[in-house]
Amino acid sequence: MSSEVTPKVPERPSRRKTSELFPLSGSESGDIEANSEPPTPAGTPNVPTRRPILKAKTMTSFESGMDQESLPKVPLQRPVRRSTTEELNNVMNNTSKELEEIESLISKHNIHNVSRKKSPTSVEEGKVAAIHQNGQRSASDNKTSTNPSPLEKNEHEGAEGNEFAISPSNLVNKSNNEVTEHSDSEDLTEKQKVHAALDNEAGDRSHFEEKLIPGDMKVQVDVSKDVEEGSLNALPPSGITESDDKAEKFTKHPESSLEELQKHQEQQEEKIFQNPTDEESTTSLNEKQEGKDNMEVNSQPQGPSDTETVIAATSSNVPSQIASEEENDVPVIPRSRPKKDFEAHVQKEELPNTQEKRVSEECDSTLISTEEESKIPKIPSERPKRRAPPPVPKKPSSRIAAFQEMLQKQQQQDLHNNGNSSATTASADIAKKHTDSSITSDTTKADFTSKLNGLFALPGMVNPGQLPPSLEKKLSSPDTESKLGPQDQSQAKTGPLGGTRRGRGPRGRKLPSKVASVEKIEEDDNTNKIEIFNNWNVSSSFSKEKVLIDTTPGEQAERALDEKSKSIPEEQREQSPNKMEAALCPFELDEKEKLPANAESDPLSQLPQTNTVGNRKAISEESLSPSEAIANRDQNDTTEIQEQQMEDQMEVDMERELSGGYEDVDSALHSEEASFHSL
């Protein structure tokens, strides 16, 4: 075969050996190194010999492994609850457009742009007003805002353009105020600007506006007019300036300004009544603006050159002076008497009526809306639970029901008896009443006891429905006793003490046959029966003939010798009285008479006599009564005598056997038989 056909045997695969867990000895390690194969490549991972120990999963190891950023942070303070005024703030924000419209109207019809008069004599009035304003400032300490409103700034600027030049100190103050106003205006929100504009208008309103009546601008004009008229009267005729001409123009044409103010008031009333929330916001901020105006006047310098600011303070803060008078109770006397304006008075009287009508209409609308809401049915969230049925009253027991019926019957009977007795007593005569007083007293007692019906335990009471007979006799009248016959009384006495009750058991069921067939035992206590029976009997079957046949002559001779030796005690015994001999039968007496004659001839004739004595005793015991037999038994000593005789006979027989006194064998045998029979 060629080499190509021969198969190639593969090499045997070599086993890889892992490192031992425990170190081997030197010889073993050398053998392993010699036979070891090349080591495995370094790229394969080394399998650890031991399993790594698990770390305890405690809280410390858990916290150390986690990042601090992943854990939630607990807030230091509890979140503050949102205030309840948040809804009101939302309402104010929604009405910002309407407030802007009101602000534009106020800026168009602003009264503060009217030029005011300046005179050196009006400085004193400004000082008086400043004194009252200082007193009012002490009452409102919490209002510390000192920045002037933008409307007042415009007012001062208009006065500067038309009147004399202002001193440099006023310019410095104005520049400072403008800087502060500019910085504050940047911080204010739109809402705060609107409120500031409303505050400026509210600061110039009178006490009538505080009562929710808008359009008080006319009152301010009247007050300022009175003040200017007083100042004109105080001026000298020579010192007339341009400001005086302007003031005269203002006083000469008051009607045109009044018409414009009335129109403005009507427009403002309509808007405010349409949005009452805006009016409330303006009235609430009225007091704040008054405090700001007071601070402005005090912050400005008071001197002969600053007469313009003093006049503005007196004209704008007349309501504040009235309030300060009410607080401090210090009256202020004006220099000129105010003139009465009939048109303003009429308008003031008409305004409250219109306001009351509108307020009443609003109240009616609110009431109608609440009534409509109340009429609308509301679906409850949860279904109402059904009420449980009323508890059924328990039925009274039979005893309670019977007791209630009994009481009702008694009450009805008592009512009938009382009605009948009242009719009879009215018809009875007075004489009969005196005679029958004792009888009626007895009947009333009986009625009283019958009403009790055993409710109270009386002595001797057995049945609650009946009274004892002794008590009935005492309480019953003599007429009732006479009416009752002897038979009725006997029946009443022999009545049952208590009602028989039926035994409790299964109703409507028959008893088992074993129980039903049992006869009842009836005990009769009145009958007595006597029975006589014999307790014991004595019978003797030993006869005289039988003894004679059994005994031999040799035995008879031996017995005779024994009896002779014992003759002395027998004679004594015969001499002692014996009661048993008197009870012997007559045939035994005949035998006893015959025996003594034969006894002398035959000495063995005494044995039958002993037997006859036993027979006599048996006969006598049968004839005697039990008590007599017991007495004779105690006195009889026959049993003891017989025992003594037997013992003596046995001793004699023993002596004969030991001595060998028998002559023949026959005599010895006969003696043994005799001893056996004697036993």
UniProtKB/Swiss-Prot annotation:
Location of the region described as Interaction with SH3 domain of ABP1 in the Swiss-Prot/TrEMBL record: 383-396
Cellular compartment(s): Cytoplasm, Cytoskeleton, Actin patch
Protein's UniProt keywords contain Cytoplasm: yes
Region of interest called Disordered, as start-end residue ranges on this chain: 1-85, 111-522, 549-580, 593-679
Residue ranges, compositional bias (Basic and acidic residues): 9-19, 179-213, 243-272, 339-361, 372-383, 471-482, 556-576, 667-679
Compositionally biased tracts (Basic residues): 501-512
Modified residues (Phosphothreonine): 18, 58, 85, 277, 552
GO cellular component: actin cortical patch
Modified residue annotations for Phosphoserine: 36, 70, 104, 183, 206, 231, 284, 324, 576, 620, 623, 625, 627, 667, 671, 675, 678
Record's compositionally biased regions (Polar residues): 133-149, 167-178, 296-323, 414-427, 437-452, 603-614
Secretion signal span: none
InterPro entries attached to this UniProt entry: Aim21
Keyword Protein biosynthesis among record annotations: no
Keywords: Cytoplasm, Cytoskeleton, Phosphoprotein
Family: Belongs to the AIM21 family.
Subunit structure: Interacts with ribosomes. Interacts with ABP1.
Purpose: Involved in mitochondrial migration along actin filaments.
Protein name per Swiss-Prot or TrEMBL: Altered inheritance of mitochondria protein 21
